[in-house]
């Protein structure tokens, strides 16, 4: 892979997305599903979420180490996927590791004598001289620094831990944490931020890339990469040029291992971070697309969606798009922010959020340093429920996704038209909003799903998108009025055309290949 080839190296095939245990309890269950005749030629990629590795929180995103979780996956499973011709996408959680990682456990055991003393970020050392000491011993950064901090939870992002000498230390902890005292002994759970100024961290990154490549990875999603670079005086989210410097360094390592990097970042459209990523030859995770599809179907208008499609073409943006995913439906991404126009007006976004909540969704917000809400972030719901649990709407949304330029990623629960699992979200407690869209399916659920027209129709369209050479050709938007959507692909004599009526939610797909014309009608 050349330095200029990251976007060009992104595979143009349909990608399944699931946890290793989403189907019948383990990765072998997904392999069995993909070996069924209904799935022949359907998927060329599989994004396996990080609970395939050893982890302890956040369903995989709190990594202990990158060895395979033997309860859920095996080398034989990976070999079987390779035999099916399915390339793999894995996560590398750049910003943090679990408290349970060997590195943090060594720090807790040996304290200042640990070889990993600088592997994580000592909060007080980082902010030394830049704030005041709180009564409990941690530094409270001065207001000009606090105003720049981007928070994922209320309060300061710190975890207080006790060293062997009895001293309490404070470590940067952007995401989850929990401290318990049982019989006088402290226990910790948390996702601890890594110190990207430490050479040991970069050795760890290199070793991890090499391991993922050995597993058969083609794409590596860089989870939470925008939080990695931290410097006094800068925001802790996508500060520049430090973030770009880190990303370029990671790119060099990835290219040595034949890997395509997919940086994961949620940011307002108006910040134009997606443009910068694309201009630097990185694929873009299209977090704009889900909300734009909902808007197009709810409003029966192509206006906002076509504006984004036009930008993809004009700026040569290589995307990975999705409807649903393991996370929520992004909404902050659609905003313009203080620097520019959004893909949707704020009032339209607020109205969409209200509709999704009326349809059973849950809201995730972002917070300031004082614990107050500063922005909505995402709505947690299955995409089927977000569309009002209408088969016709989900079928139309899938067709639009498969015809829009980009690598289409398909959440397993959307494929099976899964509804909001409100009971699971309630059982999971205050932070359980994401469980609404993570229902595991048994082999019997898969069997029953494959008897439903909405599932079979999606698979029919997915097979066409994955296998037809038309989608390796030239794309165009056919001019129509704003209630229709015509998207056309042509590669030589092979043509695929989507003709959708957004008002009636009916559409046809016409496919011409080797002198034969096939028309798929859905109404």
Swiss-Prot record:
<feature type="binding site">
    <location>
        <position position="96"/>
    </location>
    <ligand>
        <name>sucrose 6(F)-phosphate</name>
    </ligand>
</feature>
<comment type="function">
    <text>Catalyzes the reversible phosphorolysis of sucrose 6(F)-phosphate into alpha-D-glucose 1-phosphate (Glc1P) and D-fructose 6-phosphate. May be involved in a new pathway for the degradation of sucrose, which could become phosphorylated on its fructose moiety during uptake via a PTS system. Shows strict specificity since it does not catalyze reactions with alternative substrates.</text>
</comment>
<keyword id="KW-0119">Carbohydrate metabolism</keyword>
<dbReference type="InterPro" id="IPR017853">
    <property type="entry name" value="Glycoside_hydrolase_SF"/>
</dbReference>
<comment type="similarity">
    <text>Belongs to the glycosyl hydrolase 13 family. Sucrose phosphorylase subfamily.</text>
</comment>
<feature type="binding site">
    <location>
        <begin position="326"/>
        <end position="327"/>
    </location>
    <ligand>
        <name>sucrose 6(F)-phosphate</name>
    </ligand>
</feature>
<feature type="site" description="Transition state stabilizer">
    <location>
        <position position="327"/>
    </location>
</feature>
<feature type="binding site">
    <location>
        <position position="434"/>
    </location>
    <ligand>
        <name>sucrose 6(F)-phosphate</name>
    </ligand>
</feature>
<keyword id="KW-0808">Transferase</keyword>
<comment type="subunit">
    <text>Monomer.</text>
</comment>
<keyword id="KW-0328">Glycosyltransferase</keyword>
<protein>
    <recommendedName>
        <fullName>Sucrose 6(F)-phosphate phosphorylase</fullName>
        <ecNumber>2.4.1.329</ecNumber>
    </recommendedName>
</protein>
<feature type="active site" description="Proton donor/acceptor">
    <location>
        <position position="264"/>
    </location>
</feature>
<feature type="active site" description="Nucleophile">
    <location>
        <position position="223"/>
    </location>
</feature>
<dbReference type="GO" id="GO:0016757">
    <property type="term" value="F:glycosyltransferase activity"/>
</dbReference>
<feature type="binding site">
    <location>
        <position position="264"/>
    </location>
    <ligand>
        <name>sucrose 6(F)-phosphate</name>
    </ligand>
</feature>
<feature type="binding site">
    <location>
        <begin position="221"/>
        <end position="223"/>
    </location>
    <ligand>
        <name>sucrose 6(F)-phosphate</name>
    </ligand>
</feature>
<dbReference type="InterPro" id="IPR045857">
    <property type="entry name" value="O16G_dom_2"/>
</dbReference>
<feature type="binding site">
    <location>
        <position position="58"/>
    </location>
    <ligand>
        <name>sucrose 6(F)-phosphate</name>
    </ligand>
</feature>
């Amino acid at each position: 892979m050349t330095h200029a080839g990251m976007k060009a190296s992104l595979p143009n095939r349909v990608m399944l997305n699931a946890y290793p245990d989403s189907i019948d309890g383990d990765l072998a269950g997904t392999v069995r599903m993909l070996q069924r005749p209904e799935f022949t030629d359907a998927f060329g990629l599989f994004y396996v979420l990080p609970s395939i590795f050893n982890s302890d929180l956040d369903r995989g995103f709190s990594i202990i180490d990158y060895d395979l979780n033997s309860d859920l996956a095996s080398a034989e499973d990976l070999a079987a996927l390779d035999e099916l011709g399915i390339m793999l996408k894995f996560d590398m959680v750049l910003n943090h590791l679990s408290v349970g990682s060997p590195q943090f456990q060594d720090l807790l055991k040996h304290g200042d004598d640990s070889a990993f003393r600088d592997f994580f970020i000592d909060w007080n050392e980082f902010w030394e001289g830049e704030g005041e000491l709180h009564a409990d011993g941690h530094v409270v950064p001065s207001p000009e620094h606090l105003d720049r901090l981007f928070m994922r939870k209320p309060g300061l992002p710190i975890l207080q831990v006790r060293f062997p000498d009895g001293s309490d230390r404070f470590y940067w902890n952007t995401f989850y944490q929990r401290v318990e005292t049982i019989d006088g002994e402290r226990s910790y759970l948390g996702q601890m931020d890594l110190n990207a100024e430490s050479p040991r961290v970069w050795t760890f990154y290199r070793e991890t890339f090499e391991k993922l490549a050995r597993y058969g990875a083609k794409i590596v999603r860089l989870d939470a990469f925008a939080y990695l670079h931290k410097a006094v005086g800068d925001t802790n989210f996508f500060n520049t040029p430090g973030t770009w410097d880190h990303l370029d360094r990671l790119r060099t390592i990835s290219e040595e291992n034949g890997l395509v990097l997919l940086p994961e970042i949620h940011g307002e459209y108006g910040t134009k971070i997606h443009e910068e990523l694309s201009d630097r030859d990185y694929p873009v995770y299209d977090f704009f697309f889900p909300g734009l599809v909902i808007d197009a179907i709810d409003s029966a208008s192509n206006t906002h969606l076509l504006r984004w499609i036009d930008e993809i073409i004009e700026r040569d943006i290589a995307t990975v798009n999705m409807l649903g995913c393991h996370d929520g439906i992004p909404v902050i991404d659609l905003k313009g922010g203080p620097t520019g126009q959004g893909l949707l007006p704020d009032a339209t976004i607020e109205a969409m959020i209200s509709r999704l909540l009326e349809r059973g969704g849950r809201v995730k917000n972002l917070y300031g340093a004082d614990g107050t809400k500063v922005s909505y972030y995402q709505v947690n719901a299955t995409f089927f429920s977000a569309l009002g649990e209408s088969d016709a709407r989900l079928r139309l949304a899938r067709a639009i996704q498969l015809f829009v330029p980009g690598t289409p990623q398909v959440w397993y629960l959307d494929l099976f038209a899964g509804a909001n699992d409100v009971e699971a979200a309630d059982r999971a407690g205050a932070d359980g909003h994401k469980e609404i869209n993570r229902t595991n399916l048994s082999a019997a659920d898969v069997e029953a799903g494959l008897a439903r027209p909405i599932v079979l129709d999606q698979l029919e369209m997915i097979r066409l998108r994955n296998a037809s050479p038309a989608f390796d050709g030239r794309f165009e938007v056919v001019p129509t009025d704003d209630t229709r959507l015509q998207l056309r692909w042509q590669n030589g004599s092979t043509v695929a055309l989507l003709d959708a009526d957004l008002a009636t939610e009916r559409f046809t797909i016409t496919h011409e290949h080797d002198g034969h014309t096939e028309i798929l009608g859905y109404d």
